[in-house]
């Protein structure tokens, strides 16, 4: 879902039951958002890429208010969600997914460039922090069947020369033990990076992705860890049985998690 733009901030949300984004933003508030995929966004293939780097603020004190805010956002964007969420039964069935943490990003820098043109110099270099430990690469055998499902160029996420997160679309060629990158930034030897392959159909009729974390050697990306998300070839995306089971499990575990955190039950 596209973030809301409120009070000169970008507003994102993540689940209370899967709070990794919020934890990461609290640990290091420097974040980035790349606007590059026109699907379900109102943008077109002719629009330029836009990268926003900013400082994140995490809102997780009032989960009731956060959840109501998220429900209002969903109902304003989707007729299907309006149908489901008008019913208390529908809201309670999705409670584990609807329980939200909000992350608001105060923009600090904006980079805009045309598709097919060179990257802006400010994000044209990948740095390696002193704390990053390069690990042994893993084989791509398991990923090869997945890669053919993703026709759109993947997103390469990295740290720029000042240590700020950045992300760009790149072209890739998959080899047996590495992935060749073209159209991306120059890389410091051993710079950490993450490739995200994303498949979105229509207005979230299907939403599937996986990530490959690794490091760079010149223009070669060496994978260290494969991370799947949201579906398989025959069971993917929103509306799938797999995602419905995921939401059902979140809802089942939500009361215990709220109690563990000392929070009151949600009123839906």
Positions of PLM-derived features:
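Short beta-strand segments
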Residues: 1-17, 23, 33-37, 44, ...
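Surface-exposed connector loops and short turns at secondary-structure junctions
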Residues: 22-26, 188-189
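A short, hydrophobic beta-strand micro-motif
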Residues: 28-33, 192-195
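Generic recognition of flexible, low-complexity loop/linker segments
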Residues: 142-145, 155-157
């Amino acid at each position: 879902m596209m973030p809301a733009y409120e009070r000169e901030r970008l507003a994102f949300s993540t689940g209370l039951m899967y709070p990794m984004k919020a934890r990461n933003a609290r640990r290091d508030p420097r974040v980035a958002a790349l606007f590059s995929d026109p699907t379900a966004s109102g943008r077109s293939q002719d629009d330029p890429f836009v990268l926003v780097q900013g400082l994140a603020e995490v809102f997780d004190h009032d989960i009731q208010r956060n959840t109501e805010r998220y429900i209002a956002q969903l109902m304003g964007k989707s007729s299907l969600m309006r149908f489901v969420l008008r019913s208390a039964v529908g809201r309670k069935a999705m409670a584990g997914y609807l329980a939200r943490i909000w992350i608001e990003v105060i923009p600090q820098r904006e980079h805009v460039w045309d598709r097919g043109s060179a990257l802006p110099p400010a994000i044209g270099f990948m740095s390696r922090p002193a704390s990053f430990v390069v690990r042994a690469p893993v084989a791509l055998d398991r990923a090869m069947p997945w890669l053919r499902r993703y026709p759109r160029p993947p997103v390469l996420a990295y740290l720029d020369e000042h240590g700020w997160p950045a992300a760009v679309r790149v072209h890739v060629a998959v080899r047996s033990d590495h992935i060749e990158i073209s159209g991306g930034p120059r890389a410091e030897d051993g710079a950490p990076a993450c490739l995200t392959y994303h498949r979105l159909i229509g207005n979230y009729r299907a939403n599937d992705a996986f990530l490959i974390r690794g490091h760079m050697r010149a223009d070669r990306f060496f994978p260290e860890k494969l991370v799947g998300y949201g579906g398989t070839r025959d069971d993917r995306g929103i509306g799938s049985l797999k995602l419905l089971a995921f939401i059902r499990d979140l809802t089942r575990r939500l009361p215990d998690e709220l109690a563990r955190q000392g929070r009151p039950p949600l009123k839906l």
